[in-house]
């Protein structure tokens, strides 16, 4: 529902999430670089626009994308047409990825520094096809109910195996492209599709089965792009037409243009990113399902809010953070202390992740369907910590040298080990968190930092060493989120309904004791906390599974109940 209170709450949270970015920029600019940026006013205005745009974007998600995505999934599940679900999954994956802005940036950079071997359009097609294929695999897993870690571990083995065949120039790029395929708009819709299917199909759990599609969308491009690299480096000769790396980096973040044409061009770019999603939804809703969308007016308003909010969000970033972040990265490489570079990389990773719109949306959904067992703010902190560690470690690799494959293999080993330790409900969310963290805000800043470091440090190759930071930013959140799950499980954190659950044996003994001792209050320990219930009631209502009906009946009689009514 559209209401002012919801928007104001989202606005408050948006500016709270931007605070870490502001503090990081101010600290490094004033304390380390010791200069006041020339464009500080535009940066300030840009941050304000980012905050408002983020709030509008999130409101649009809640009103438009989440409801229609979950509704479509439910309709397909009720229809029982697996073929149409699979086709819909592929179209959503392919159609939303091919126009992804972050993918456009990385593909253009790769084409520019590969001596013409890599074609930007072909690379985008390869990645888009791999994401469509990934969503199909993820939907098939939900339908069949197979545990996600079987697929993920197999995927990791294939990724590592592919590195032994692909040229070293393509490995870092392939790992990075696994992180840029999930956009700010795609992530919520894909998550809604998975959660909607898992909520509708009998025997599926939305927490255990609903998440995971984003993880597949991050994994498969690494495999497909490496095989594409084998082809281009085997059969395509390098051309003499190549843009210098330093020039290419600068041109990816031009000074923001306030002209009407530039503003309209930016808005058109966002519309192009969102319209394919809307087109796919309308086609399947009206042509395949032959069913009108409920609350169509609200859904269209929601999509309009997503477009306006995302456009404002990007304008705000271009006005301040993009150019400032790249300038600071170049200034820091001239500093004698590598520790400052690592600290800046980690701080940028943490602050941009906390402001990532798609992470906020997914964290809210995780809290909702986990009955509050997963705290959305703490989940975001865990993800941001993982990104921070990953980017700092990635910067360390660029500065000191080293093969990215060894770092990635060790990271995968940690992920696999934690998969068998962490509670089941957190594993799909942890896998998804790796893809959620690298989209609108993070990718341009992190890519610029990596290529800037590789360009300015002697002995480094921008194509081999410059890419890879996004891969680190995608890998380590999986580790920190699983660790968060282990900690919450050890602490005995319960969901809202679990907190109120009363075990039958404890209820029976407590009521019997109260009756025999003439007590006015009954004490039940239940879930480790002492609950007190006033004995001023004529009936007790207990919710139990069907198989426990006889046990509940016996417990009530032993407690002295004069009658028992069972409602199923």
How would you name each of these model-derived features?
Residues 165-171, 224-232, 313-320, 445-460:
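Hydrophobic alpha-helical transmembrane segments in multi-pass integral membrane proteins
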Residues 82-159, 338-418:
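Helix-loop-helix junctions within the multi-pass membrane cores of secondary transporters/permeases
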Residues 1-59, 74-75, 79, 191, ...:
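Signature of multi-pass transmembrane helix bundles
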Residues 508-568:
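Positively charged, small/polar-rich N-terminal and surface patches that mediate targeting and assembly
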Residues 17-19, 48-55, 117-129, 176-190, ...:
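Structural signature of hydrophobic alpha-helical transmembrane segments
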Residues 34, 57-70, 96-106, 168-170, ...:
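Transmembrane alpha-helix boundary signature
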Residues 41-44, 60, 111-124, 140-157, ...:
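Transmembrane helix-loop boundary segments of multi-pass membrane transporters
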Residues 135, 139-146, 170-173, 195-209, ...:
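Alpha-helical transmembrane segments
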């Amino acid at each position: 529902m559209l209401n002012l209170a919801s928007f104001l709450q989202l606005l408050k949270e948006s500016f709270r999430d931007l605070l870490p970015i502001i503090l990081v920029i101010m600290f490094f600019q004033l304390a380390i670089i010791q200069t006041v940026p020339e464009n500080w006013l535009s940066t300030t205005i840009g941050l304000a626009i980012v905050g408002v745009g983020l709030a509008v974007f999130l409101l649009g998600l809640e009103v438009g994308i989440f409801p229609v995505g979950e509704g479509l999934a439910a309709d397909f599940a009720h229809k029982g047409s697996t073929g149409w679900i699979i086709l819909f999954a592929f179209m959503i994956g392919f159609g939303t990825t091919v126009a992804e802005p972050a993918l456009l940036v990385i593909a253009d950079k790769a084409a520019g520094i590969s001596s013409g071997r890599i074609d930007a359009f072909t690379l985008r097609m390869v990645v888009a096809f791999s994401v469509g294929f990934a969503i199909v695999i993820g939907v098939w897993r939900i339908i069949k109910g197979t545990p996600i870690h079987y697929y993920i571990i197999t995927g990791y083995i294939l990724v590592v195996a592919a590195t032994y065949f692909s040229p070293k120039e393509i490995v870092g790029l392939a790992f990075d492209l696994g992180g840029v395929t999930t956009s700010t708009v795609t992530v919520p819709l894909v998550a809604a599709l998975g959660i909607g299917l898992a909520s509708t199909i009998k025997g599926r759990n939305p927490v255990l089965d609903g998440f995971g599609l984003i993880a597949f969308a991050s994994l498969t491009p690494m495999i497909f792009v490496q095989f594409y690299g084998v082809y281009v480096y085997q059969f395509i000769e390098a051309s003499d037409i190549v843009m210098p790396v330093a020039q290419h980096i600068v041109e990816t973040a031009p000074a923001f243009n306030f002209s009407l044409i530039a503003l309209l061009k930016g808005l058109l770019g966002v519309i192009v990113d969102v319209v394919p999603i809307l087109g796919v939804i309308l086609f399947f809703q009206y042509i395949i399902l032959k069913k009108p969308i409920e609350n169509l007016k609200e859904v269209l308003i929601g999509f309009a809010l997503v477009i306006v909010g995302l456009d404002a969000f990007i304008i705000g970033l271009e006005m301040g953070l993009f150019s400032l972040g790249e300038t600071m990265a170049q200034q820091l490489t001239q500093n004698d202390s590598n520790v400052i570079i690592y600290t800046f990389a980690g701080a940028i990773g943490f602050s941009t992740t906390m402001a990532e719109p798609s992470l906020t949306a997914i964290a809210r959904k995780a809290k909702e369907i986990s009955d509050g067992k997963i705290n959305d703010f703490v989940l975001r902190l865990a993800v941001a910590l993982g990104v921070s560690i990953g980017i700092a470690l990635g910067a360390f690799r660029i500065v000191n040298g080293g093969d990215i494959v060894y770092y990635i293999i060790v990271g995968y080993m940690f992920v696999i080990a934690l998969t068998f330790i962490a509670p089941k409900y957190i594993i799909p969310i942890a896998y998804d968190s790796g893809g959620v963290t690298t989209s609108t805000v993070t990718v341009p800043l992190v890519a610029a930092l990596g290529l800037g470091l590789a360009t300015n440090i002697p002995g480094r190759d921008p194509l081999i060493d410059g890419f890879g930071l996004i891969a680190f930013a995608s890998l380590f959140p999986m580790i920190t989120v699983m660790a968060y799950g282990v900690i919450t499980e050890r602490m005995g954190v319960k969901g809202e309904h679990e907190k109120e659950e009363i075990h039958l044996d404890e209820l029976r003994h407590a009521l019997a004791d109260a009756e025999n001792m003439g007590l006015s209050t009954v004490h039940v320990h239940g879930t480790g906390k002492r609950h007190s219930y006033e004995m001023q009631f004529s009936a007790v209502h207990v919710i139990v599974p069907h198989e426990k009906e006889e046990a509940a009946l016996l417990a009530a009689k032993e407690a002295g109940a004069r009658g028992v009514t069972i409602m199923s």
